[in-house]
C-alpha cells in the first residue's frame, strides 16, 4: 500500500470495502465500461456540450441577477438610489417654478408604507430589473391621494386596438382584478412606465435581460471558483483500475459503488488532507489545472464589465479591478449621472407630469440638477461661459442658467 497524501488516518473499514469492490465478480456481467488508455478512471474531463442560459422570466432573472449577483445588485442600487435622491421641480404653463403643497405632500409620502425617496428608488429599480414599472393611483381621477407600486410579474397588459391597452390584469395569489383603460383618452388608474423593446409592443426591455448572458458567465465563474476552493484549488485526480489478472474493467455496479465510496470519504473541503490508501489493482493519477483552466478571474472580470455596461455604470464604480476607464472617481460619477441617472430621472418625472400634473395644476416636472453634487463641474463650466458672454443682458444670463427674469429688466 502507498500513502499518497499527508493528513489524518483513513476512514476505518474503507480498505476492506475497496478490496470487496475491486474483487473480480464471480458472475460475469454482460455490459461493462470499456477501459481507457489509463485503465478505469473515476474522473475524466470532457469538452463543453453546450451553454445553458438563465430563462428570460422576471422571477428567474431577478433571482439570478439582483439577488445572487453582486455586480448587478450594486449597479441597480447605485442607479436607483441616485435617481431617487434628486428632488423634482414643478413648473406652470409659462415655465415658472411653482410649489403645489398637495402634490408635494403626495410625493413626500405616496402611501402609508413608503416615503417618497424609497418609492422612487423602488420604481427605478423595477425599470432596471423588469423594464416595466406599474404605479396604481388611489383616489379621485387625476388627483390621487395615494400611489402604490405593483410588482411587474403580477401585472399583465391586456392588448387592445390602436396601440392602446384595454386594461391591466393584476394577480396576487388567488385574487385577480382588472383595472380598465379609457379607450378614448387612454387614461387609467395604472401608470405604466416602460423602456424601449424592439420586439414587444406592450412591455419594456430591461437592462437585466440584456445582461443575462454576462450574468450567467459571472455566476458560473464564481461557482467554478467555489468548487476549486472546495477541492483544494485543483481536481484531486483519477483513480485507475489496472489489475494484473482478472477482468480489465470493473462491472457497472462495482464502478458506481466505488465512486460513491470515494465521494463520501474524500471529496469536499471537509475531507481535505485525508490520506488515500490503495490496494492492488488501483493506481492514483494526480491531475492539475492548466493556466487556461485557472484563468477564471479574467473571465469573471470581463463578464462584470459587460454587466456594468448594460446598466450604464462605469465598471470602476462597481468594483471591477483594472477598469480605470476614467482618470478619477469624480469623473466616473459625472459620467454615471450624465449618461444614466439624469436621463432616467427625467423620463420618470415626465411620466408623472403627464399622468398627475393636470390634476394639480402642474404643466411639467423636472429633476433639480442643481442639487446633484456630482454635476458641479458642469455647473461651474456653464456659469463661467455665461459670465464671459458680455453681449447678454442680465435676464438673458439668468435664462441661460435656468432662472426666471427680473421684472425691472427688459
Please place each PLM-identified region on the residue numbering.
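Structured, contiguous alpha/beta core segments that scaffold functional sites
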Residues: 2-296, 302, 306, 313, ...
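Surface-exposed loop-to-helix/strand elements on domain peripheries
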Residues: 233-252, 274-384
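Charged substrate- and nucleic-acid-binding regions of tRNA-handling and nucleotidyl-transfer enzymes
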Residues: 372-410
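Alpha-helix C-terminal capping segments
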Residues: 89-93, 352, 356, 389
Amino acid at each position: 500500500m502507498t500513502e499518497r497524501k499527508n493528513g489524518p488516518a483513513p476512514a476505518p473499514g474503507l480498505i476492506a470495502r475497496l478490496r470487496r469492490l475491486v474483487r473480480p465478480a464471480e458472475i460475469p456481467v454482460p455490459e461493462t465500461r470499456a477501459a481507457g488508455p489509463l485503465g478505469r478512471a473515476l474522473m475524466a474531463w470532457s469538452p463543453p456540450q453546450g451553454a445553458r442560459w438563465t430563462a428570460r422570466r422576471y422571477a428567474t432573472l431577478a433571482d439570478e441577477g439582483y439577488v445572487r449577483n453582486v455586480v448587478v445588485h450594486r449597479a441597480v442600487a447605485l442607479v436607483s438610489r441616485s435617481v431617487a435622491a434628486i428632488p423634482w421641480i414643478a413648473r406652470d404653463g409659462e415655465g415658472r417654478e411653482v410649489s403645489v403643497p398637495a402634490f408635494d405632500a403626495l410625493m413626500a409620502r405616496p402611501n402609508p408604507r413608503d416615503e417618497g425617496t424609497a418609492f422612487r428608488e423602488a420604481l427605478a429599480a423595477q425599470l432596471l430589473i423588469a423594464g416595466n414599472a406599474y404605479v396604481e393611483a388611489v383616489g379621485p381621477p387625476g388627483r390621487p391621494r395615494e400611489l402604490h407600486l405593483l410588482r411587474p410579474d403580477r401585472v399583465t397588459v391586456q392588448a387592445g386596438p390602436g396601440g392602446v391597452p384595454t386594461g391591466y390584469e393584476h394577480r396576487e395569489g388567488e385574487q385577480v382584478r382588472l383595472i380598465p383603460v379609457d379607450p378614448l383618452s387612454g387614461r387609467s388608474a395604472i401608470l405604466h412606465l416602460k423602456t424601449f423593446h424592439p420586439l414587444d409592443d406592450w412591455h419594456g426591455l430591461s437592462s437585466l435581460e440584456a445582461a443575462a448572458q454576462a450574468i450567467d458567465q459571472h455566476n458560473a465563474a464564481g461557482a467554478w471558483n467555489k468548487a476549486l476552493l472546495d477541492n483544494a484549488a485543483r481536481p484531486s485526480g483519477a483513480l485507475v483500475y489496472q489489475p494484473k489478472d482478472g477482468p480489465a474493467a470493473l462491472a457497472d455496479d462495482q464502478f458506481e459503488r466505488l465512486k460513491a465510496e470515494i465521494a463520501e470519504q474524500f471529496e469536499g473541503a471537509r475531507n481535505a488532507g485525508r490520506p488515500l490508501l490503495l490496494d492492488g489493482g488501483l493506481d492514483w493519477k494526480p491531475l492539475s489545472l492548466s493556466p487556461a483552466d485557472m484563468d477564471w478571474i479574467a473571465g469573471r472580470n470581463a463578464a462584470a464589465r459587460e454587466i456594468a455596461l448594460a446598466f450604464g455604470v462605469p465598471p470602476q464604480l462597481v468594483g471591477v479591478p483594472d477598469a480605470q476607464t476614467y482618470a478619477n472617481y469624480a469623473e466616473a460619477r459625472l459620467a454615471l449621472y450624465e449618461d444614466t441617472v439624469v436621463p432616467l430621472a427625467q423620463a420618470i418625472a415626465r411620466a408623472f407630469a403627464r399622468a398627475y400634473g393636470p390634476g394639480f395644476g402642474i404643466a411639467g416636472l423636472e429633476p433639480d440638477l442643481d442639487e446633484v453634487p456630482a454635476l458641479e463641474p458642469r455647473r461651474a463650466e456653464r456659469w463661467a461661459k455665461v459670465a464671459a458672454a458680455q453681449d447678454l443682458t442680465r435676464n438673458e444670463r439668468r435664462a441661460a442658467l435656468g432662472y426666471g427674469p427680473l421684472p425691472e429688466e427688459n
